[in-house]
Amino acid sequence: MSTSVFNRRWATLLLESLTRHGVRHVCIAPGSRSTPLTLSAADNHALICHTHFDERGLGHLALGLAKASREPVAIIVTSGTAAANLYPAIIEAGLTGERLVVLTADRPPELIDCGANQAIRQHALYASHPTLALDLPRPTPDIPASWLVSSVDSAMARLAHGALHINCPFAEPLYGADDGTAYQDWLIALGDWWSSREPWLREMRQSALAEQPDWPQWRQKRGVVLVGRVSPEQGARLAAWANELGWPLIGDVLSQSGQPLPCADIWLAHPDAADRLRQAEIVLQFGGSLTGKRLLQWQEQCQPQEFWLIDDLPGRLDPAHHRGRRLVADVGEWLSAHPAHKQAPWADMLVDIADKTQRQIDTHLASRFGEAQLAQRIPALLPPDGQLFVGNSLVVRLIDALAQLPQGYPVYGNRGASGIDGLISTLAGVQRATAKPMLGIVGDLSALYDLNALALLRQAPAPLVLIVVNNNGGQIFSLLPTPVAQRETFYCMPQNVEFGHAAAMFGLNYVRADNWEQLANTVTDCWAQGGVTLLEVVVEPKDGAATLNELVAQVATWAH
């Protein structure tokens, strides 16, 4: 019987076993060697298939789907450099915890290292970046179906975070008629598994949450709560929990905590704030990937008696290497096990400092249309019952420092490796998972880097506005002590482009806004009318970085 038919049976079983572990979305790039996987995914009614012609963007599309759905997402690509293009998304997932199941089709062993076309060494292709890897053999009916499903089940049961790389060699022929009866006995050997929804092998892993026995004593001390990347529900709970304790909470742009002490990356430069925070006896950090420069500096320099870092990702997440406790736990479960004890705030003056800072920023930016004003006013543009995706580089730092985002409002970003690749693709994946209106904001170089991902936005399930802040290059380098003589040529790299033609090429609406009123009205109209709009905001190249530096320099002069 045909090899192509058994390839299909093998791939059908592989895909079906993944659905038993919650895989609903599969992202597929075109390719011949991956034909058994692609056709099997298309035939599986439990799977939603997404396609993209660029594997780098495809990986980030899957990353966004996994980020928003909190479910494992599968990726199917062909052999060769197609598989290599998934590397950035796999690295990001390894750092931020999204579960990706990467199915790379491969040539059989006899075609490796002999000059065969599109054949590379795919064993351990992604080095240490996947959490797990499974190298499958060439499909053969001599291997029982129970081996394949139990191998997948075992790997998926251990995939708590990051990527699982499953390398899938297929021999030719890859195409051919399938009469539907061949090799059915191989599948039928699994019995009533086919009519169930359970994995073949159910591994039970129980990890009891370890309560800190001295928490009743520490919660009566002077504490500070730092919140990095957590979920909307966790951010809201943390805000209420810290408030009951009377502890100041400093929230990152991805904290979704409502940032009760807004503009922290500005007011942390005030000496009075530093003096008060120095009195903290315990610091609790929830989530990693802090953004703000002043916050990172304070976190590094603080010397409490105890430093606890709570996150469900394992490993070291504290670049300052504090002595303390690294607690691997779900944030919500940890809060339930460590209730607050109501007490009076010990650092009330920080509320006054933050309020004064926010008012001064309002005044400073009131008549200055530009990147900083846009960042500060982002909350006014958010769609009701929607979501925000924040790009990297300068824009995320400005929003982190200047805006106060609503508590519990979903905010997404790629702050693991913090690259500018794949941001639009990730945004597209997030929205496909939620089907909610979305506001996205990226810089011009980020948009150029992922320009062909505009093709993914044509299938947006809800209104979407993508703001491209065009400051003509990588102006994050204007914040850094890069050599002035070489800054433009070798760091900022201005491209002198506008995005109207790109939007037209992909059939997207396009607006260029030159003032706040036009920008705000355009966004409001988009939420009402639907569709996808690329909104380009051309700003003075150095204005955003210069404004941030000005505000940090001035904060010490503001009386509180």
UniProtKB/Swiss-Prot annotation:
Disulfide bonds: none annotated. GO terms for biological process: menaquinone biosynthetic process. Homodimer. NCBIfam families: menD (TIGR00173). Belongs to the TPP enzyme family. MenD subfamily. It holds the Pfam family TPP_enzyme_N. It catalyses: isochorismate + 2-oxoglutarate + H(+) = 5-enolpyruvoyl-6-hydroxy-2-succinyl-cyclohex-3-ene-1-carboxylate + CO2. One of its GO terms (molecular function) is manganese ion binding. Its cofactor is Mg(2+); Mn(2+); thiamine diphosphate. It is an enzyme of class 2 (transferase). This is 2-succinyl-5-enolpyruvyl-6-hydroxy-3-cyclohexene-1-carboxylate synthase. Keywords: Magnesium, Manganese, Menaquinone biosynthesis, Metal-binding, Thiamine pyrophosphate, Transferase. It comes from Pectobacterium carotovorum subsp. carotovorum (strain PC1). Binds 1 thiamine pyrophosphate per subunit. Pathway: Quinol/quinone metabolism; 1,4-dihydroxy-2-naphthoate biosynthesis; 1,4-dihydroxy-2-naphthoate from chorismate: step 2/7; Quinol/quinone metabolism; menaquinone biosynthesis. Its EC number is 2.2.1.9. Catalyzes the thiamine diphosphate-dependent decarboxylation of 2-oxoglutarate and the subsequent addition of the resulting succinic semialdehyde-thiamine pyrophosphate anion to isochorismate to yield 2-succinyl-5-enolpyruvyl-6-hydroxy-3-cyclohexene-1-carboxylate (SEPHCHC).
